[in-house]
Amino acid sequence: VNNQLSGRPRNPVGGHVPVAGGLHSVGLTYARDLKAETVQVFVANPRGWATPAGNPKQDEAFRAACEAESIPAYVHAPYLINFGSHTEATVERSVESLRHSLRRGREIGALGVVVHTGSATGGRERSVALKQVREHLLPLLDELTHDDDPYLLLESTAGQGASLCSRTWDFGPYFEALDAHPMLGVCLDTCHIFAAGHDLTGPSGMHQTLDLLVDTVGEGRLKLIHANDSKDVVGAHKDRHENIGVGHIGEDPFRALMTHPATAGVPLIIETPGGKEGHAADVERLKKLRDC
């Protein structure tokens, strides 16, 4: 079925792009080389706590180009952020880091900021960690009062260690802890959800998983998809991305992904191995699965 003929809003396909040297000059040049219809960027070192100011010229050029070409843009917040940490310093740094990503997201015209849902460290109960999530994350969500503020998109993890959110139903308590805030959304990573134990293969694997997600968080909350194949088998709890169709998920579930009602118009971002050539091939592969 050609989705464009069925009147369904098409899924823009793109990738995470490098921006060192210039958000617009480097990031969007790379995106164009991928023939990307959507982009994701870091606005800080993903493995650090630094909160650098933007370059206003690059910000403006990036925002204007994305607007002119109808390219939805997203920010991925740093990996170190964990509101469930038992270390006070980590929680405080997480607040500052995420506040920075949200502010930078607004400055560059991003539609959403993706953050990992974190884990309950120090052997503590999940409920204790979720109380902490509420205490520190809810005020940040309440600060998102401008028309051009990005959504905060929660990305579940592959289920390693004391993960707060890895299966679809784990989003329930997480959303509850945050009063199902209107600025809250979900970023579904296909590799993570597969690694956490949701089998996306077979004729209905992907659709069943998406049904479960919608049952948990409600309609309209799925705002972004990280389209990644998996190097490991289902339920392996390992976060190792693979190129589309090459891993244990395979091509068919990605085709199925783009026919589910919950994903209509939702952008797909690849975070796969292989540098620019591998990325361009993955973008092309997903577009073919979408359009044929």
What annotation goes with each model-predicted range?
Residues 1-77, 81-102, 292:
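N-terminal pre-domain/capping segments
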Residues 5-8, 29-36, 54-74, 101-109, ...:
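Acidic (Asp/Glu)-rich catalytic clusters
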Residues 16-20, 44-46, 78-80, 118-120, ...:
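Active-site beta-loop-alpha junctions enriched in small/polar residues
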Residues 31, 76, 94, 105, ...:
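Conserved, mostly hydrophobic/aromatic
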Residues 37-42, 71-75, 184-190, 219-231:
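Non-cysteine beta-strand/loop elements that form the S-adenosyl-L-methionine
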Residues 67, 83-185:
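Active-site acidic/histidine proton-transfer and metal-coordination neighborhood
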Residues 89-102, 125-138, 167-176, 204-211, ...:
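Short, electropositive alpha-helical surface patch
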Residues 124, 164-168, 172, 194-265, ...:
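Gly/Pro-rich active-site loop or hairpin
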